[in-house]
Each structure stands twice: as structure tokens, then as C-alpha cells.
Amino acid sequence: MGIDINHKYDRKVVRRRPKSENVYLGLLVKVYRFLARRSGAKFNRIVLKRLFMSRINKPVISLARVTRFMKKPGRENLIAVVVGTVTDDLRLYDVPKLRLCALRVTERARARILKAGGEILTFDQLAVQAPKGKGTVLMQGPRNSREACRHFGPAPGVPHSHTKPYVRSKGRKFERARGRRKSRRYKA
């Protein structure tokens, strides 16, 4: 009699290529796969890995955040590299002169960067200018700012938990009784 070996956990889920069928993304992957193999630079390995990522793991980054990162001492004239989208931020009054490389830059963000005398590069241009990632600053948007992430963590109702409950309605009767009023068992 044989034994039933559970193969439930055998498959290691790692992206070796992007899920997207975008041909331009595929060409970038070819370029950076070559650079990652031949240059030995860690920068190229990271960019390649991020090109494979899902949209959730390539969150957008605002122009304000890019500016904040580039204002740190010693980062003048370096190229900001974002494997994702850069969006405009209306709260940012003055846009400094930036050199930026991103997969996509929204129309308004692009206009503001160029108006400030900045430069926007594509990843194939970056591969020519900085094949080993020299003179670049790699950055990414906040991954846990999605609304869905607020529901992750210790169960709502557990002490010191700030996890958002999944509630069908925000009325008086929903998640506002037990533990919150004396008439319903206890008030904490």
C-alpha cells in the first residue's frame, strides 16, 4: 500500500517573467536580463525583479515623494529611478530640477518636471547612460497604502489592534455594541 505524499506546498511561486503581455515591457526585460547577467551589478538585478512584479507591488509614487527623496544631501544631479508610475502632487508647490527615469509618468507630472528644466528618461535610455546603475537613486511607492492593507493584522476587537473590520454598513447597530456600551455585556 502506498503512502499519500502531500504535494500542496511543492510549487515555489516566483516570477521569472512578467505576467503582462506588453511587448515593450518584454523588450525592457530582455535588456535588463542581459545587463543583470553580464554586468554583475546589483542595481540591474533589482530593476529586473521589479519589472516582473504585479501592479500591487509596483505602487505609484507621487512627485512630492520623489522630490523629498532627492532633496537628501549628496543626491544632487543623480537620476531618480522608479520601476512604476510617477504621478503629480498638487500639494507640491515648487518642483525642483529633476532627472527622472520611470516606466510611466502622468501627463501633468511630466509637464511640471519639464517646465522646471528637468529631464525624463526611459529605461532603455538609462541602460545606455548608466548600465551599472552608477549615479542613480532607486525608489518605490508605499506598498501598504492600499485600502485593503488596513484590514490586515491582528483581528479587529483584539486589544491594541488597529485593524479595520469588514463591515457591510457603518450604522449604529454594526460593530458598535458589545464592548462599547454597558447594555451589551460590557463597556471597555
Curated annotation (Swiss-Prot):
Signal peptide: none annotated. GO terms for cellular component: cytosolic large ribosomal subunit. Coiled coil: none annotated. It comes from the Eukaryota. The keyword Cytoplasm applies. Keywords: Cytoplasm, Ribonucleoprotein, Ribosomal protein. Residues 152-188 are annotated as: Disordered. It is found in: Cytoplasm. Residues 161-171, 178-188 have a biased composition (Basic residues). The keyword Ribosomal protein applies. GO terms for molecular function: RNA binding; structural constituent of ribosome. One of its GO terms (biological process) is translation. SUPFAM superfamilies: Ribosomal proteins L15p and L18e. InterPro entries: Ribosomal_eL18, Ribosomal_uL15/eL18, Ribosomal_uL15/eL18_sf. Belongs to the eukaryotic ribosomal protein eL18 family. This is Large ribosomal subunit protein eL18. It comes from Ixodes scapularis. The gene is RpL18.
